[in-house]
């Protein structure tokens, strides 16, 4: 990988991991335009680690509070808002794990094409618009409850389909279930931690077993750039949606999907 490819792909990963705009849709464009080969598992792990570090550091106070409360709920039987939120995030992760292990190969075989990505980018963008329009804006993430958390987790499992956007579909589900915009985004971001960590661990296992060649310079640069982009993305996204809602991202998704359709089929 040359330096330009590392920079572009790392920034795309960092920005699109948490924006509701689909990383898959953005990653196919530079590959098609510049004729780049697959960046490899090692680079994927590096940029995922950068994104993971960004969300963990940004929400470090909330994560520490949840971890302490979660341990207290296990060993002392003490329940609190933080311990409940931790349990709900764990519960919301289960559907993605189940679907990931059972349907990953099928999705890779039948739903990985650029046409699917273009269409799902538009469809799930419209669904996000609908959710934002009907959102009741009532609850914080601490009022979610286990049933709503599980439903958001089921929605997260749909993100296995390329073009869906993990953050987009989970925020959509959370809005439909009554969470405030900022609360929906925060819950989605906290949900991403076990998912990104799990994906990175699985890819690391494949790297070890398949003896991949590692370009440490590309990995270090990719990880750092992904971290910076992801952290900035989280910060500004939470501020934007509090004032403007999801409309800018819906418009962008639809425009991108239409452009991809034209790029692919015309």
Curated annotation (Swiss-Prot):
A Pfam family recorded for this sequence? BacA
* Stored InterPro entries: UppP
What EC numbers are recorded for this enzyme? 3.6.1.27
Membrane topology listed for this record: Multi-pass membrane protein
Keyword Membrane, does the record have it? yes
Localization recorded for this chain is: Cell inner membrane
Which UniProt keywords are present, listed alphabetically?
A: Antibiotic resistance, Cell inner membrane, Cell membrane, Cell shape, Cell wall biogenesis/degradation, Hydrolase, Membrane, Peptidoglycan synthesis, Transmembrane, Transmembrane helix
Primary localization class, coarse = membrane
GO BP term (any one): regulation of cell shape
EC class of the enzyme, as a word: hydrolase
The protein's matches in NCBIfam families, at most eight in alphabetical order, are given as: PRK00281.2-4, undec_PP_bacA
Classification via HAMAP family = Undec_diphosphatase
Report the protein name in the record: Undecaprenyl-diphosphatase
Per the UniProt record, the source organism is Shewanella amazonensis (strain ATCC BAA-1098 / SB2B)
């Amino acid at each position: 990988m040359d330096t330009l490819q590392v920079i572009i792909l790392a920034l795309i990963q960092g920005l699109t991991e948490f924006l509701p705009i689909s990383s898959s849709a953005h990653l196919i464009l530079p590959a098609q335009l510049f004729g780049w080969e697959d960046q490899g598992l090692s680079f994927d792990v590096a940029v995922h680690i950068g994104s993971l570090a960004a969300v963990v550091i940004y929400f470090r106070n909330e994560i520490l509070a949840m971890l302490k409360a979660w341990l207290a709920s296990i060993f002392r039987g003490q329940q609190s808002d933080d311990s409940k939120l931790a349990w709900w995030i764990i519960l919301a992760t289960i559907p993605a794990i189940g679907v990931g292990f059972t349907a990953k190969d099928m999705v890779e075989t039948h739903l990985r094409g650029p046409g699917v990505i273009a269409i799902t980018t538009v469809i799930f963008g419209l669904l996000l618009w609908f959710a934002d329009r009907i959102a009741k804006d009532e609850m914080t993430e601490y009022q979610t409850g286990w049933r709503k958390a599980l439903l958001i987790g089921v929605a997260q499992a749909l993100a296995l389909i390329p073009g869906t956007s993990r953050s987009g579909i989970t925020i959509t589900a959370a809005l439909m279930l009554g969470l405030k915009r900022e609360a929906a985004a925060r819950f989605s971001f906290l949900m991403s931690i076990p998912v990104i960590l799990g994906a990175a661990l699985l890819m690391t296992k494949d790297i070890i077993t398949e003896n991949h060649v590692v370009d440490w310079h590309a990995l270090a640069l990719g990880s750092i750039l992904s971290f910076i982009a992801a952290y900035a993305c989280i910060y500004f996204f939470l501020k934007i949606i509090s004032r403007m809602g999801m409309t800018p991202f819906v418009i962008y998704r639809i425009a991108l999907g239409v452009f991809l359709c034209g790029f692919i089929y015309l």
